[in-house]
Amino acid sequence: MRNAHEMEKALLALFPAAGLEYSFPEISELLDSRSREDKIELSLALQKLLKKKILQESGEGKFTLFGKDKTALTGKVDYVNPRTAYIRLEGEGKEEKDVMVQPDDLRGAQDGDLVEVELFASRRGKQEGMVTKVLQRARNQYVGTLRMKGSTGWFNADYRKMHDEIMVAESDLAGARDGQKVQVQILHWGGANRRPQGKVKEILGQPGEHHAEMHGILAEYNIPLRFSEETEAEVAQFSGVISEAETRGRRDFRPVLTFTIDPFDAKDFDDAISFQELSDGNLEIGIHIADVSHFVQPGSKLDEEAFQRATSVYLVDRVSPMLPERLSNELCSLRPNEDRLTFSCVVKMSRDGKISGKPWIGRSLIHSDRRYTYEEVQTVLEGAEDPNAEVLRLLNRFAIQMRETRLASGAMSFESTEVKFVLDENGVPLKVIPKIRKDAHKLIEEFMLLANRLVAEYAYYFEDGKRSNPMVYRIHESPNPDRLQNFADFAGRFGYKINVSESKVAMSLNKMVASLEGRPEQELMQNLAIRVMAKARYTTKSSSHFGLAFAHYTHFTSPIRRYPDVLAHRLLWNYLQNEARPEKDKLETLCNHCSEKEKMAADAERASVKYKQVEFMGFQDTSRLYEGVVSGVTEWGIFVEITENRCEGMVRVSELNFDQFDHLEEEYCLVGRRSGTRITFGDKVKVRLKGTNLEKRSIDFYLEEIAGATLQRKPAGKQPKVWPSGKRRRK
């Protein structure tokens, strides 16, 4: 016999969608509830669902899902923990509170899914409801570990918001064995009375193996591990020799001094700079970009797959390219001493760095004379001899001027520090080194920003008499006022004043960045400020770029690794040739897809960095002291970032056993009751490694010193807890 809760769940499973109707006898038969006791429980469950307005009675004595009067909202599932999920509302209902949903009421929906949710009557001020329809799945495959129970596989996903165990039938194991890391594709999503079911799509290897883990990260974020045979076959058809027909109509820059500047280990050179003096004493500077759109034609398998990928993904040890390597590293790469097809933005500049006239934009042909690395150019900028030293130093002076102009116009000066790894032949991390951006990097960056801005302006003002042409713009909206105010309040506690008025906020934030120079909290405050900013995205609606202080901006300079740049090239060429204009709505759909894929790629890249940081720390001496900075404070512990390698870990409450602590949430600190010890965001500390967990991608530390004071921890045993502000244990 089912209890009331089980009966309610069984009833809900009978009504997966609107339109189904059952009488009481039909329900009793379907649920095999024939005994008197079962029918009583069934009747009670029906009455409960009627009262909740989940079900309603039709005029024919049948039951169906509650109809038109029920409030239906749309949102995405945030499955925060195994006991609770929230529907983050969007669209017309977004002014409502988020809707809390019990796991049984998700009806098979998972984290990130776009769903329709219906509200229950308000309970104790909470807005609760149940999922009635899954509109769009966020993902249909997961990466994790397979465990065998008899002949059946049970799969646990690495993704921390996938809380359901997935059943894999013997016929769907594809040869996978107990304990292996696999990729599983969902066959059935399950529901209130059944677990999800899947099949093994790919065996990745053993957990902890370098290649298995990196492949696992790619698979986890739906990034393909290889190109389709059809795409590779199309690429194989390209001859590799530029024909006379392909050069026709292109402006020839081959006689002009041209060079590339890239990382030392780069293979996909998608931008080059040319430089020549004109007869009138001015300078002509060309920004030449690989003409990927010449090869990637609409309607081809190559174009279809490039669009689906939308971006190259750069993990710690490998690249998952947007284009097959024959294109990205060979035919499109602007390699030295080879003719290459390009799309160019050419500007005329005076010797004092002022741009005159309109840029020339069009298809071109170049021949790179020299491939520079950033390191080589930096030595030249610092005084080393080079045949092109005068040109490089002049370009650097122009780049510095352009940067100063941007900042004076309200551009943001944030620079977050990234890390790079030195790996051995087996992928084991030997070193973690913060990347340092120098003038050589900024030189190229400023000229690429210039080209992107000029191309966006060119497209925006390029009219065919009646209307502006659609374009793929890169926009960055102003920060959300509430989030900005919260950050200003936070920064104010540390002595930084932020003016949140729209006209002053950029200058105010830049002033804060300047005052942070050399302080322990510099990197942390900058990262927090960056998080407050809106996310840049692609759209057909031209709007200003807040972070760069540009009225119009696009992505034009990296078509080997970004699909929006391919679209920008394609659109520009259509307009220059007066060819058909695309439908704006369809183009907006492409923009949305590219924005989503960009976020997914960034998440995958961060996951690979975190994994390798944890792996690196796992090999370190547990007796060594590391200098670090408190990067976060919670009631369950503090986060510390090691200064020399940017590895972040946690000192848990159980290790802060030299005192009892109150968590003062609004002051971002822990305060010891007896000692008065104050641990707050930005504090300099020394920590010692306690341990690592690769599966959870976490690092644990012992706290040894705060501001130079050595701490005396008690032996392990029953530990005091951290008490939230204002709460005390009852005597």
Set out the residue ranges of the language-model regions.
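Charged, low-complexity terminal tails
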Residues: M1-V168
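Conserved, carboxylate-rich catalytic/transport cores that coordinate ions
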Residues: R137, Q141-K731
